Amino acid sequence: MSDSNNIEDNVVINTITNTDTNDTTPPTTDTNTTPSVTLKRRFVGKKKIAAQQQQQNENIDNVTTTKTTTTTTTTTTPITKDIVTTEKKVKVFGRGLAMAAQQIPDEIMNDKELNLAVKILPSNYNFEIFKTIWRIKQASAKRVALQFPEGLLMYSCIISDIIEKFASVETIIMGDVTYGACCVDDYTARSLGADFMVHYGHSCLIPIDVSEIKMLYVFVDIQFDLQHFIETLKFNFKQTQKLIMVSTIQFSASLQSSREPLSEYFSNIFIPQEKPLSPGEILGCTSPKIKFTSPDGDEENNEIVIYLGDGRFHLESIMISNPHVKSYRYDPYSKVFSLEKYDFQEMYKIRRDAIETASKATKFGIILGTLGRQGSPKILDHLEQLLKSNGKHYTTVLLSEIFPAKLDMFSDIESWIQIACPRLSIDWGYAFTTPLLNPYEAEVCLGGINWQSVYPMDFYSKEGGKWTNYSK
């Protein structure tokens, strides 16, 4: 769980340090070429971004983690490579770049001023500026809403200025918090008078054919030192080890590109898919269940999960849905490769206790999340029927964000069911004074299903249960 008291310490394992690598960390901006686009005073600033990028480069180049079982030792002195780098370079194929380039008109692709403006952005972050401008012009849009996750907001003003100049439109940067693809806020964009919306950094959970306005999803593929990732896996595992590879959408293209060179060394590589997500993609609430092929417990032949990405939130999802599989994380920014652990038994106990307490309640509150598209009216209808059939009284509350202090104001509510983010209950449910159940837990509490021995992570799965978005 996200609380540090419930997570065992990570174990940092063999990490290859390469001080002579072709790193694709965002470079500093070329100061010899000045783009013609006029950057507004609200713009974050090239100098600030360049300084951050330079500091990140220095941190990655100078820090190496040595092999240990319980502690992490770091050194800031330059060291030599401890592997032999292969001559074959790994090709990273961006998502549909070649096809998109063939479709975008030459007057956009070859616009010198536009190309100079795009150089302000990090070269290894694919914001698909050319495609965005082309789509906006195709749609004859006048006002464009731009929605970014927190980690990309620092680039929002640059992108806004570029789009306004080269697409001749007005832009709106939507500053409300965006936790994931479920937070696509097309309703607000429409109410603000936008006729086109660009959502950055997440996959298409909300199909463009059901959104309220014309939409474009930009996944923001991030390229990094892929060769280091490949060599790290080869350095740490035997050729017979079965690898199950997953990532977030930003690194999905790189994950696919790594498959071919890794297959030359490992005999069994598997990239799972939990539809409607892309192959290898996982969400914090949705991950595939891995089918075991080695029930005899032979550790060398068992599957292991390799997660490519920073942070633990998404990784914990596939760990929860596959508690018997070892999980490793490769951070593409720090180049640290670590064995990750999770206290499943404590999580099970906390959530079952909450369900047991809630089962005795007579007055429920149902929270329909209004942050983007988090709340599902279909799930709401299903839970209302369950509550009625169990003779429970309930009140429906609309909330964009859920905090303990806010819910404490509803003193007559004995238990809550939130239809927003399942992980909110799992990770932070203990912080609320009254039980805060997610739809799956409510299903168990109200007798719709028995407690599952493996906690389901299927909230956006096409094969999910009655408590999920795509249930039939």
From Swiss-Prot:
Enzymatic reactions: L-histidyl-[translation elongation factor 2] + S-adenosyl-L-methionine = 2-[(3S)-amino-3-carboxypropyl]-L-histidyl-[translation elongation factor 2] + S-methyl-5'-thioadenosine + H(+)
A Pfam family of this chain: Diphthamide_syn
Keywords: Iron, Iron-sulfur, Metal-binding, S-adenosyl-L-methionine, Transferase
Entry's Gene Ontology BP terms: protein histidyl modification to diphthamide
EC number: 2.5.1.108
Cofactor annotation remark: Binds 1 [4Fe-4S] cluster per subunit. The cluster is coordinated with 3 cysteines and an exchangeable S-adenosyl-L-methionine.
InterPro entries: DPH1/DPH2, DPH1/DPH2_1, DPH1/DPH2_2, DPH1/DPH2_3
Cofactors (names): [4Fe-4S] cluster
Entry's transmembrane regions: none
GO MF entry, a single one: metal ion binding
Assembly: Component of the 2-(3-amino-3-carboxypropyl)histidine synthase complex composed of dph1, dph2, dph3 and a NADH-dependent reductase.
Protein name, UniProt field: 2-(3-amino-3-carboxypropyl)histidine synthase subunit 1
Lineage: Eukaryota, Amoebozoa, Evosea, Eumycetozoa, Dictyostelia
Gene: dph1
